[in-house]
Amino acid sequence: MSSLEEDKRLNSIQYLLQSAAVCRALGGKRIIFHSGSCGKQSREAALEKALDTMRRAVEALDEAGFADMTLCPETMGKVGQLGTLDEVLALCGVDSRITPCIDFGHLNARTLGGIQTKADYAAILDRMAEVLGDDRARQFHVHFSRIEYSAGGEKRHWTFADTQFGPEPQPLMELLAQRQLTPVVICESAGTQAEDAQTMQQMYRAARNV
């Protein structure tokens, strides 16, 4: 979406249209996507291109009959990629139907371990609510896994058993329960998605005393 080449940006819109058709056929409503990398341009220039592509994508989806679909730009794990929290929230500002996909493992990786405490999670949730409003922020999309990182950000996804890698899921599940937030949460652990998703569900239910 942020490419210097217009053809590639236009192709991104077509990919979203194709994804919308498949999503509808499967009974889904949310389309998660990556907004691109900065490449040889500044972050500001890359974001402006992505914002323009996003506006065109929303228009194209509406014209094609997919106005009921929710676009979800994802926070990204590599430093060179477009996808900081604020960049994703800026993309969400294009249309009130756009919902952020917050990948907490990615944010932890690109900030080189910036999510260490419950307060760190709370700051992310607070920022979403500040920019989007409480109602939109309540129903965001979540990807979660422990991720190994280097100086450039994300390297590899791991499992919940690999506790040498962060971030920790427990504080997030507690905050979701305490704040009565209702995101869609997808576990992206390496090979143990179902098991680790169940672990998060148990943490969430315990925090709600269910």
Predicted regions and their residues:
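Short helix-capping segments at alpha-helix termini
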Residues: 60-68, 93-97, 132-136, 178-180, ...
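Gly/Pro-rich active-site loop or hairpin
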Residues: 3, 44, 82-85, 108-182
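Short acidic/polar active-site loop segments enriched in Thr and Asp
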Residues: 29, 182-183
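Active-site acidic/histidine proton-transfer and metal-coordination neighborhood
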Residues: 1-101, 109
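A structural signal for the main folded, soluble domain(s) of proteins
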Residues: 48, 54-56, 60-70, 115-119, ...
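Active-site beta-loop-alpha junctions enriched in small/polar residues
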Residues: 36-38, 74-78, 105-110, 142-149, ...
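C-terminal helical cap(s) of enzyme catalytic domains, especially alpha/beta-barrels
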Residues: 194-210
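Conserved beta-strand positions in the central sheet of alpha/beta enzyme cores
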Residues: 32, 101, 143, 185-186
